[in-house]
């Protein structure tokens, strides 16, 4: 995509995801209205899962019409095909210049991946050793403790390759997108609303409101990401999420949940939708060098799913833990996500460059410097 429109075009991907989720919220709410709570727990949830067959078939069908990316085609020596794809996005002269930039970028020496594999080997060895010792000692949280501790220790090893630095920035960018707790809101919203005192039907309806806010502010990001840049949106969004989560946790702690708690969740969702939702994907599409983009993008996305798993797995533990519930009344988890929001803002400010208006080839030169 052209540098001046790339943020807008990539952000539409997030819009499509959120739009699909909002449709699912409506479908689930409609299914839930067909019976009582007992029916929903025995039969209704099966219909919710079965309804996903329709979009899955449509996705597979439309996937046949998606073209390969120009950079992939150039890497495979199919330059004429790459020029054809570029010509659909810009005029012939600009397409030719863009194609030449892409071809030149592949002539440059790729960053060495050896330090990355050395880092991953160190992390894996530390994880296996830590998990083995904790399991042998009978620790019930051995897996998550070993994962986090081994990664933090591995990060202490010196980084001698800018390729590894790029990978770590991508991995942490993906990780923070999940560690701020967004999928707790998206996955567990009905349960959170029930904790606030809402009935099942009302909780599903409030989830639709969350989805509508998510969609609306994603549209805002689409039309501002190329105007204001990536870094300002990401930093502001992280701070908005941090403040709203800290306040939400406080409403639980002080046993004053109500409309204010719902407003905090909506503000949090808006903060994510205007920043880390779409803009994180824009940055991931822009910061990696052409020569290793596909490999490193896969690593970053894998890190995102690992972080997603950790957050969605640990939230019920934090929320239902008897000691934490008695002491903080369900507030601890939200405070943790608030702190993660602050760390995410600091991470963007310190380590992530502004990519607005820069070609992907220019970004490769930035990392080399």
Regions found by a protein language model. Give the residues of each.
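Short, well-structured alpha-helical segments
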Residues: 95-104
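Alpha-helical transmembrane bundle of multi-pass membrane proteins
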Residues: 1-90, 106-369
